[in-house]
Amino acid sequence: SKYATNCIHKEYLQFKKDLLGDLCTGNINYVEKNGFKGNPIYTLVSHRHPDITYIKNLDIESSLNLLDELGVALWFYDDGSLHKDKLFYNLNTQAYSEEINRDLFAPYLKEKYNIIAKPTIERKKDGREFWYLRISKFEGAYEISELLNKYPVQPYCYKTWSSETSQLWRKLQEELKSTNMENCSNKMKSCILKRLEQSM
């Protein structure tokens, strides 16, 4: 099998191409009109390789077990979005069932990265239902942002917290630890965070 991907950002495909090394020696191609809307896009295709075929044929649980930090970062670059005001992340896993989101994706993120991902339903006007993962600012959003910062991709810098927000978050953690309030409610954490923000 081959690995094929596309993106509106050429820099991101170059990042992936560098990771693929000898598996991908071709050029990044520009397509002037792509899809229904006819928007421009960049594409990248690897060589055929048995390792790609092997990974492609794995079940979801086995694929998750192969993921490292970089793999999770790419997952959020590809399918994640950050709410800039409320500082939570959505991971767009709507292609998968409620059961896969609940029983595979959420436990994996919790056990490996202490990211608490809540399966959330999206109901369409025509009655269709889709599930995705939501990660609140108090339950793993900081960890996601820090993970993305380990593997920076300039066009996607908007998917990470600002340095000021990260600094404020670290101050919150220090205060919670010093006052033995690490297990307090998210509402209480929000109040403390607001106070710290006002004092800066």
Segments predicted by a language model, with ranges:
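Internal intein/HINT superfamily modules and their associated LAGLIDADG
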Residues: S1-M200
